[in-house]
Design a protein with these regions (language model features):
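N-terminal module-boundary/linker segments of secreted carbohydrate-active enzymes
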Residues: 1-63, 68-75
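Substrate-binding cleft of extracellular glycoside hydrolase catalytic domains
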Residues: 63, 67-181
């Protein structure tokens, strides 16, 4: 596959470089999905209630998308996550996507570190490579569906396997080699 950056992605990269030399962008996880004493209210945000505007970055977790579920591990419908990513883009903000995927070897959650061969099992030739490739395809299809009504692909910051220098996730530092990671 050849990957070509869209003009929107190029614009995002340029803006991130510009911001990094002047300051930072404030973010909040699931900001428009739930907050203190509310859940699912359209357009609501605790950050906006306190500060007068939405955060520059809103993060969402794609966990359970790989399983074909309609709800994320945070119990948010993926259809709402998609809608909120598009809303954030329309406001000029950035959406960050994490993916606390299940442990493909044991069936446990991301924090199941009971086996040190999970990463090895998803690599080409591994027992769970095909399963993992299918999971990646589901996430890829979701990200590719993030388009405006005019067909513009919405750029996102995708951060799978984050916090890899710790060992609390099955992809963590003590659970695989740097080459496997």
């Amino acid at each position: 596959n050849t990957f070509v950056r869209t003009p929107e992605t190029e614009h995002l990269l340029a803006n991130l470089k510009k911001v990094s030399s002047r300051g930072f962008m404030f973010g909040h996880h699931d900001d428009t999905n739930y907050g203190i004493g509310w859940e699912g209210d359209e357009g609501r945000s605790d950050v906006k209630s306190v500060c007068g505007d939405y955060p520059a970055v809103i993060s969402f977790d794609l966990a359970h998308l790989e399983l074909g579920d309609t709800l994320s591990r945070d119990k948010v419908p993926f259809s709402k996550i998609r809608r909120e990513i598009l809303n954030q883009y329309k406001r000029g903000g950035l959406s960050s996507l994490s993916w606390h995927l299940r442990n493909p070897l044991t069936g446990g959650d991301s924090w199941d570190v009971s086996d040190t061969t999970v990463v090895k099992s998803i690599l080409p030739g591994g027992a769970n490579h095909e399963k993992f490739a299918g999971w990646v395809s589901k996430v890829s299809a979701f990200i590719n569906s993030l388009q405006t009504e005019d067909g513009v692909k919405v750029p996102v910051l995708f951060r799978p396997w984050h916090e890899h220098t710790g060992s609390w996730f099955w992809w963590g530092e003590k659970l695989c080699t740097p080459e496997e990671y």
